Each structure stands twice: as structure tokens, then as C-alpha cells.
Amino acid sequence: MSAQVIAIDAMGGDFGPRSIVQASIACLSATPSLHLTLVGQPSLLEDLISGLPAADRARLQVVAASEVVGMDERPSQALRGKPDSSMRIALELVRDGKAQACVSAGNTGALMALSRFVLKTLPGIDRPAMVAAIPTQTGYCQLLDLGANVDCSAENLYQFAVMGSVAAQALGVHRPRVALLNIGTEDIKGNQQVKLAATLLQSARGLNYVGFVEGDGLYRGEADVVVCDGFVGNILLKSSEGLATMIGARIEKLFKGGAFARVAGAVAMPLLKRLQADLAPARHNGASFLGLQGIVIKSHGSAGVQGFQSAIQRALIEIQENLPQRLHGRLEDLLP
């Protein structure tokens, strides 16, 4: 297998580079064909990788960046005021062909603005969208947009549906079912943009559009791709993650309540731990910026080692599936 090269914004996120570097080292150990470029403060990064075995160190490069984009900075400041930020340098490595993907846990708005400026969008795409896998009763669905576009036109939603369908196919879903997230399944439900998007999707050739889906239908697995604006999608994503964490904590507390509960917990806990691990946000961390002329994966700023590993793994899959090129090849057929 040919080498995959991923540029890592090592200075982004809430906790600094330590967990990012640990996740990067773990991915190197698990994937012999992987090469990583850590972008950030060289002295700090070199210290964190100083004990790495020579074989792994040979697949790890450090590229200097003198600036860091803060988590609370405006995108305009990152775009105009920090030309040597670790985030920007990582994206420029992708643009220049020195890396095949960029992974960052940094400021979402800044990452989107820089990605659009440095990498540009694919022909026919007005706005990139954030997409991630959401666990359902039957497997997973791809949910987009997750916050990059708070206000969306019907045409934006249509483009998101096209991109989501192609992404789901790249991840192994045959003829993915595409749905619009709505407050009901009847044709009369929804705001004007959702209704107009439905009209566009109903007439689209090559898309398996199945209509509207409600929030509970998403979790029942009624669609493989669920489309909404970024305002709704971000709230849904954060609510899902909070619910999964709360359920796990409540279950653990329940089985510590008394002697009988502890005995029952000892029997049930292995299965419950498996369920908790399957639903854990860290396992599904990593949202893809679809619609760019390059692969960009956004990790949660609060992600730990396992979460950042998941983001790198998503980047690997998209590299292996050549996702931007696949998108480009399908857009001419599916966009009006």
C-alpha cells in the first residue's frame, strides 16, 4: 500500500499538543503506511516525540509554525492576522501536495475560513459542509451540516445531500438513502427552504431521496444520509453526545446503589461497557469538511487521545477512498 501523509495541526484544541502527539504516535504504530507531519512549535513537539522508536520517528516530521489560532479568535483574525499559524501551515501542506489531508482540533470557524481560502471549494459547490457519522439502531448515518452554515438556502441543502450521498458511498453504503431532517414527515411540514430543497431532491436523478425524517427516525436508522442546516445539526450533534454521556453515567450510578445492584452490575457491566464504548463521542470524533479541493477533518477541541485517533482514522479512510476526486466526478451528474 502506498504511503498516506497527513498534516496535523498540533497546536489546536483545548488541551495543547500532548494528547494530539500521543494520538499521532498511536496511529503510526497501528498503520505502517501512515506518515504524519506535526505542525507547531518545534522545541515543544520534538520534546514530546523524543522517546519514539527510530522506525516510527522516520515516519514523523515536524514543521515549524510560529503562531497559534486561539479557540475564541474570530475567523477574520486567523485569516488576515496569522499567516504563520499551525492551522494555516497544515492546510498549505495539503494545497502544495506535501500532505493528503489535514486534521485539526482548533477553532471551527477559523478552520473553515482558512480551508476555503487555502484549498478552495470544488466546482459547483457554494459552501462546504461538516459531516460526521451518527450511531443509529441499524448502524450509522452521515449527518450534515454540523455547524459550518447556520443559514442555508434550498440549493445549499441540495448540495449537502449530493455530497453526503457520495461520502456515504465512499464509506461502503450501497445506494444510500438520503433524507431531510424535519419536524414531521408530511409534505406540508417544515420551513420554506426545507420544502424547496425537497422539491429539488425529488427531481434529482441518481439520488435515492426518501423524503423527510424526524429526529427519532434518524436514530431508528431510517436514512443513511440526513441533511439539515448547521444550526439544527450542531444542536442535534451536541445533544446526542451529551445524552450518550449522561446515559453512561446514570447506568454506572444505578449499579452502585446497593448489594443487589452491585451483583447485577457485575453481571451486566461487561455488556453495558461495550454499549457505552460503542456510543462514546470519542469513537465517532472527526467531522469532515465536504466540498473542498482537499481533505480536512475537524476534531472536537476537547478530544482526548482516543478521540483524536478517530479523527486521524477518518482522514485515512477519505484518503484511501480519494473522496474529493470522487465528489468532483459525481457533481457534474448530480448538480442542476
Swiss-Prot record:
GO molecular function: phosphate:acyl-[acyl carrier protein] acyltransferase activity
Top-rank EC class of the record's enzyme: transferase
Keyword terms of this UniProt record: Cytoplasm, Lipid biosynthesis, Lipid metabolism, Phospholipid biosynthesis, Phospholipid metabolism, Transferase
GO biological process, one term: phospholipid biosynthetic process
InterPro entries: FA_synthesis (IPR003664), Phospholipid_synth_PlsX-like (IPR012281)
Enzyme Commission identifier(s): 2.3.1.274
Catalytically driven reaction(s): a fatty acyl-[ACP] + phosphate = an acyl phosphate + holo-[ACP]
SUPFAM superfamilies: Isocitrate/Isopropylmalate dehydrogenase-like (SSF53659)
Pathway(s) of this molecule: Lipid metabolism; phospholipid metabolism
GO CC aspect terms: cytoplasm
Highest rank taxon of the organism: Bacteria
Compartments, as annotated in UniProt: Cytoplasm
Principal place of residence: cytoplasm
PANTHER family for this protein: FATTY ACID/PHOSPHOLIPID SYNTHESIS PROTEIN PLSX (PTHR30100), PHOSPHATE ACYLTRANSFERASE (PTHR30100:SF1)
Family statement drawn from the similarity comment of this UniProt entry: Belongs to the PlsX family.
Assembly with partners or alone: Homodimer. Probably interacts with PlsY.
Role this protein plays: Catalyzes the reversible formation of acyl-phosphate (acyl-PO(4)) from acyl-[acyl-carrier-protein] (acyl-ACP). This enzyme utilizes acyl-ACP as fatty acyl donor, but not acyl-CoA.
Name the record gives this protein: Phosphate acyltransferase
Gene designation: plsX
